[in-house]
From Swiss-Prot:
HAMAP family: ATP_synth_alpha_bact (MF_01346). F-type ATPases have 2 components, CF(1) - the catalytic core - and CF(0) - the membrane proton channel. CF(1) has five subunits: alpha(3), beta(3), gamma(1), delta(1), epsilon(1). CF(0) has four main subunits: a(1), b(1), b'(1) and c(9-12). It comes from the Bacteria. It comes from Synechocystis sp. (strain ATCC 27184 / PCC 6803 / Kazusa). This is ATP synthase subunit alpha. The record marks S363 as: Required for activity.
Length: 503
């Protein structure tokens, strides 16, 4: 027979009483009333925050968007096929956040920071909220450093500075993405962390871009965020904020970053789809009333931080696709008004073989000229004016039969300058190369070269200077200024090469 010891029993009871946890865990649970088309209506979620993450019974995550009197409207971050009417939903107490850190560099992730490149999990413990407030007025400083794109037409006429927002706008198939990718490739020696955000694009297109970046060695400093065309509208809407959050982490560490949103038209369409399904009232072109705000709060996060905060920067290159060149549509005008300038790509120029097909007349950079390198500012100051006057004369000369010698000379130079600015894809130029060809074009050295030989001349001149005028290359690379010595060397080099080329 087992002997029962009262003191032992009382000590066990005492232990149980002492270790009793009085805390009450409240679980906020609701019921799905209706689900479909990537949205759900939920009844019974009494205490839920706007934009809070919700967890459905099958593990799908949603975001609470509409907080109404008797129900909550949520958008889903998955297909939602496992969610049924009457199934339960619980709040998580969290707003959307993603992992951040150095481990993200070189990876391809989705809108929630989950890896989709098949290279295994990302070992990052730090997280950051997707929606962060933009830096205030005191936290910013004026744009003062150049962001070299490697594309002569942009760096000479529409210069971009670190911390600027420069819109790339044009019809489909005019080379918008090519400009963005060239800019990433050109940052190889610049110590800039790049983030490329692909919104609503074909998976094959994104794969091709990743291959190009890998081949050029650019994935070593680039993060790709992809929300493909077959992903839910919620993920396409969140993708740009994910890109901004990843770049922000590095910006506040004092680094320079570059974010490309390709393209924000698709994000606006995804947001329109979500809003209409949530029964929000439509406005112009059926977009909801706050479609301006989704872009302004995204692009305001790009900044050049003050020295007190480390002097880091986030440069944003948003892309917008126009329909038949209509820049006055709703989304294009919205984004033009938020950004610090735009690079307009023309279908006519593209089809005529002038690539990059930049229309210099209506492209502008509002703050970039303050950040342009001294050498480029000195050389290319009148390039934009020359090309604009040439375009005007060219249109006029179609109706005039006899032109005076000065007009003919201006037309001849304009044709050669336009040829000089042609540049193949994925081959950005360094500053000394851009300065050399701009100098040759604007100072009359190519006026006697046949138009069809100008591209060949530019390539040959760059090779000649690299081989024979290393001192010029060294001065430009180190000082970024066209000193008297550098200009003398450049003149000598151009004259020597021109004589040999003509012969």
């Amino acid at each position: 027979m087992v002997s029962i010891r009262p003191d032992e029993i009382s000590s066990i009871i005492r232990q149980q009483i002492e270790s009793y946890d009085q805390s009450v865990q409240v679980s906020n649970v609701g019921t799905v009333l209706q689900v479909g088309d990537g949205t759900a209506r939920i009844y019974g979620l009494e205490q839920v925050m706007s934009q809070e993450l919700l967890e459905f019974e099958d593990g799908t995550i949603g975001i609470a968007l509409n907080l109404e009197e008797d129900n909550v409207g949520a958008v889903l971050m998955g297909d939602g096929f496992g969610i049924q009417e009457g199934s339960t939903v619980k709040t998580t107490g969290q707003i959307a956040q993603i992992p951040i850190g150095d481990a993200m560099v070189g990876r391809v992730v989705d809108s929630l920071g989950r890896p989709i490149d098949g290279k295994g999990p990302i070992s990052s413990t730090a997280t950051r909220l997707l929606e962060s407030p933009a830096p205030g007025i005191i936290e910013r400083k004026s744009v003062c450093e150049p962001m070299q794109t490697g594309i002569t037409a942009i760096d000479a006429m529409i210069p971009i500075g670190r911390g600027q927002r420069e819109l790339i706008i044009g019809d489909r198939k005019t080379g918008k993405t090519a400009i963005a990718i060239d800019t990433i490739i050109n940052q190889k020696s610049e110590d800039v962390i790049c983030v490329y955000v692909a919104i609503g694009q074909k998976a094959s297109t994104v794969a091709q871009i990743i291959d190009t970046l890998t081949e050029k060695g650019a994935m070593a400093y680039t993060i790709v965020v992809a929300a493909n065309a077959n992903d839910p509208a919620t993920l396409q809407y969140l993708a740009p904020y994910t890109g901004a959050t990843l770049a922000e982490h590095f910006m506040y560490q004092g680094k320079s970053t570059l974010v490309i949103y390709d393209d924000l038209s698709k994000q606006a369409q995804a947001y329109r789809q979500m809003s209409l399904l949530m029964r929000r009232p439509p406005g112009r072109e059926a977009y909801p009333g706050d479609v301006f705000y989704i872009h302004s709060r995204l692009l305001e996060r790009a900044a050049k931080l003050s020295d007190a905060l480390g002097g880091g920067s986030m440069t944003a290159l948003p892309v917008i696709e126009t329909q038949a060149g209509d820049v006055s549509a709703y989304i294009p005008t919205n984004v033009i008004s938020i950004t610090d300038g735009q690079i307009f790509l023309s279908t006519d120029l593209f089809n005529a073989g002038f690539r990059p097909a930049i229309n210099a007349g209506i492209s502008v950079s509002r703050v970039g000229s303050a950040a342009q390198t001294k050498a480029m500012k000195k050389v290319a100051g009148k390039l934009k004016l020359e090309l604009a006057q040439f375009a005007e004369l060219e249109a006029f000369s179609q109706f005039a039969s006899d032109l005076d010698a000065a007009t003919q000379a201006q037309l001849a130079r304009g044709q050669r300058l336009r040829q000089l600015l042609k540049q193949p894809e994925n081959s950005p130029l360094s500053v000394w190369e851009q300065v050399a060809i701009s100098y040759a074009g604007l100072n009359g050295y190519i006026d006697t070269i046949p138009v069809d030989k100008v591209t060949e001349f530019a390539q040959g001149l760059r090779d000649y200077l690299k081989a024979n005028k290393a001192k010029y290359v060294e001065i430009i690379n180190s000082s970024k200024a066209l000193t008297d010595e550098a200009e003398t060397l450049l003149k000598e080099g151009i004259k020597e090469f021109t004589q040999g080329f003509a012969a």
